């Protein structure tokens, strides 16, 4: 099959991550994946939800939203609707629990870090881009806390990124854009750590089931894509990258 811009079946779209994108946030990044663009910002609050009070542990949570014209047809703001859609709630929870999986909450202390993910333009893979970009914003915020003496050591235990894989016309492909996603027989989102551990796998067949062998092949391809995404994260984070997984502030 032919893909947009002539990319290969096992090839990511062009990916860039720009740090310090917002002036006031403790951490921020603009991630661009092909024509998908998401601003991810990290905000540190010196408090935790009630269920974590007096535990000495922190919390990571997320919000996600689409700008009205991030999509081909105008998307009504959810504040106007007066409620979050099920899709938005699902994505917010996915981002939050994915990031929590690589943070030592006892090192974070009793504080909350909010990750706000605002989609400027949606062309497939917004949730996976939000996770990949949010990791960079979170790392930036945590490095600032360590530098200020707010936390004793770097709480990040590992890198984290996410990507989509799928079957389109019986071809296994990496990083689906909107058009490919719309025609996919199988669409799967995979979240994985730098050490290759799985955090989340969301896979759905459309029309007919897929085999265990195809599942394994999709996970292997996702692993290749995530390895490339983490290499970009490391390059963008510079010195901060060397402190991820060390549990110290050296």
Swiss-Prot record:
It comes from Moorella thermoacetica (strain ATCC 39073 / JCM 9320). It holds the Pfam family RNase_PH_C. It is an enzyme of class 2 (transferase). Phosphate binds at residues 87, 125-127. This is Ribonuclease PH. HAMAP family: RNase_PH. The gene is rph. Phosphorolytic 3'-5' exoribonuclease that plays an important role in tRNA 3'-end maturation. Removes nucleotide residues following the 3'-CCA terminus of tRNAs; can also add nucleotides to the ends of RNA molecules by using nucleoside diphosphates as substrates, but this may not be physiologically important. Probably plays a role in initiation of 16S rRNA degradation (leading to ribosome degradation) during starvation. It catalyses: tRNA(n+1) + phosphate = tRNA(n) + a ribonucleoside 5'-diphosphate. Keywords: Nucleotidyltransferase, RNA-binding, rRNA processing, Transferase, tRNA processing, tRNA-binding.
């Amino acid at each position: 099959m032919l893909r947009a811009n002539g990319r290969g079946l096992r090839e990511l779209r062009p990916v860039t991550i720009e740090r310090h994108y917002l002036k006031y946030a403790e951490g921020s990044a603009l991630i661009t994946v092909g024509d998908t663009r998401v601003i991810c910002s990290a905000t540190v609050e010196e408090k935790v939800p009630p269920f974590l009070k007096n535990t000495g542990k922190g919390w990571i949570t997320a919000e996600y939203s689409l700008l009205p014209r991030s999509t081909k047809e105008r998307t009504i703001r959810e504040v106007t609707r007066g409620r979050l859609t099920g899709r938005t709630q699902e994505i917010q929870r996915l981002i939050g629990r994915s990031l929590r999986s690589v943070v030592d909450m006892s090192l974070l202390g009793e504080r909350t870090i909010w990750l706000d993910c605002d989609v400027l333009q949606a062309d497939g893979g917004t949730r996976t881009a939000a996770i990949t970009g949010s990791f960079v914003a979170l790392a930036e915020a945590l490095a600032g806390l360590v530098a200020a003496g707010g936390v004793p050591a770097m709480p990040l235990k590992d890198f984290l990124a996410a990507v989509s894989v799928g079957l389109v016309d019986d071809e296994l492909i990496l990083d689906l854009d909107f058009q490919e996603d719309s025609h996919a027989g199988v669409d799967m989102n995979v979240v994985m750590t730098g050490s290759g551990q799985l955090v989340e796998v969301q896979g759905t067949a459309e029309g007919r089931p897929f085999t265990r062998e195809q599942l394994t092949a999709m996970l292997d391809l996702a692993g290749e894509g995530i390895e490339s995404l983490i290499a970009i994260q490391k390059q963008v984070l510079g010195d901060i990258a060397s402190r991820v997984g060390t549990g110290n502030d050296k």
